[in-house]
Amino acid sequence: MKDKAPVSSQQDHFSRGGAVGGKPISDVRGTSRPFYRKPVSHNTIAELAEGFRVLSNGQKTISIPMKEVSALMASVGLHLSDEEFHEVMRVFGQGEQTNTEELSFKDFLSLMMCEVDDTMLEEMRGAFLHYDKQKTGFVTKKQFTELFATGGECSTPEEVEELLTIAEQDETDDKIDYNRFINELIHRLNFM
């Protein structure tokens, strides 16, 4: 029997079954394919550079304090503890930074342009698998609401309602296809 050639793309990782916590995920209904942003225009980079200048209080600088990034997140309703903030930076690809006190413009661009990768997909799916022990790809509306209202960064009732709108649950049996939800969420995040 011939060995299969290794798959070099991320796109089929979850359709073949990924892993959460070192344990394989068996195939569930729906597949996940990463969505990639379109090429970044000069105007987009200019807008991000302006945002970076605002965070640096108008100074032309090569880095900004992480506390400014954390304050920005808090100003838009993302109130994170220091530990949670550092975890967000790690998940969004900033874990390899040597300077954890400042964010360079290059790292700022990476953060703003970050795409959802397999690690993030595994973490999202892992959260749903807590409720989906049978690995059907579905959770109830109650489980979905509980996950976002009580887990990790607790969502407000309004935010949960918005997430439910994105989830488009099946009205007949009150189930939510979390693979479809994750795909839609990824699409929205990657094309913001």
UniProtKB/Swiss-Prot annotation:
Keyword terms of this UniProt record: Calcium, Metal-binding, Repeat
Residues that coordinate or bind Ca(2+) 2: 132, 136
One GO cellular component term: myosin II complex
Lineage: superkingdom: Eukaryota
InterPro entries, sorted: CALM/Myosin/TropC-like, EF-hand-dom_pair, EF_hand_dom
Residues holding Ca(2+) 1: 100, 102, 107
Domain notes: This protein has four EF-hand domains, two of which may be functional calcium-binding sites.
Protein name listed in UniProt: EF-hand protein 5
Naturally occurring in which organism (per UniProt): Trypanosoma brucei brucei
UniProt lineage: Eukaryota, Discoba, Euglenozoa, Kinetoplastea, Metakinetoplastina
